[in-house]
Amino acid sequence: MRETYRRTLQQRIAKRRGLALNTKPNQSISKAVIEFIRSTVVRPIHMLVTEPIVGFVCLLTSFQFGLLYIFVVASPWTFETTYGFSLGAQGLTFSGFIVGTMFSYAAIIAGDRFLYQRKLHQFEHEHQAPGTATEFPPEHRLYNAMLGSLILPSGLFMFAWTAEYAIYWVVPIVAQAITIFGSIQIYVPVSMYMVDTYGPLYGASAAGASSLSRYTLSAVSLLFTLQMFKSLGTGWATSLLGFCALTMAPIPWVFYRWGPMLRARSKYEREL
């Protein structure tokens, strides 16, 4: 992909034009370490707790990531206890995730090409006057996420109440495909929305906050998944996840409607 980091681009332009590069004075090791910690640890955590966009995007992406790990543990257990699947057959049940993932990325590519890119070209045509610094709203990234917010809880509830011995085992596998389809529809667009919102200067820090929350929840989810499914059963354990997804479903819609207001209040100004 093309380089997008502003400082790197400025350095390349200056070098190409034979201009003097603005270099920072040499720092001591202690100051360099402090600066490194500030930009890679302190800033992401600060953005996580002070920036609503970062906080809610991290909540969404962490749930999607944790959901994947939950199903890695819960799905084999469900098909073993409900349908008596062998170890090899349990592995084949993940074919639903494979199919759902393939269709999901096809939908994301289609959404980018036929919705996002079309809106972008229209915006550029309307704001092509010289000196115009108007920025294309990153909220247009959220079309697929709004769709996924409706599909994900539907897939979870479908899996919850079709994973029964009396119902053919293909049905819950289809429900898994629907679930992962909706999950990826949310995960990819909201991550891109956050990076677009904070730009090349602070986008990496926002992504760092997302990584911190994602992997923390993923690690924690493995500690309670099997106990939760054994205690509540597949129906109510997955329904609990469905209710969580349903509670978070409005987030992409809120971003699309009030995102400009939230961005205007941000402490991390995006550089054009």
Located regions from the model:
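Short coil/turn segments at secondary-structure boundaries
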Residues: Q11-R12, L59-L60, P172, I251-P252
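Short acidic/histidine-centered micro-motifs embedded in hydrophobic/aromatic stretches
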Residues: E51, T61-S62, A209
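A single, central transmembrane helix in multi-pass transporters
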Residues: F56-S62, G66
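C-terminal transmembrane bundle
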Residues: F65, Y69-I70, P76-L272
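Primarily residues marking transmembrane-helix entry/exit sites
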Residues: T50, V54-C58, A166-V170
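Central mid-sequence intracellular linker of multi-pass
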Residues: M1-G55, Y105-E126, V254-L272
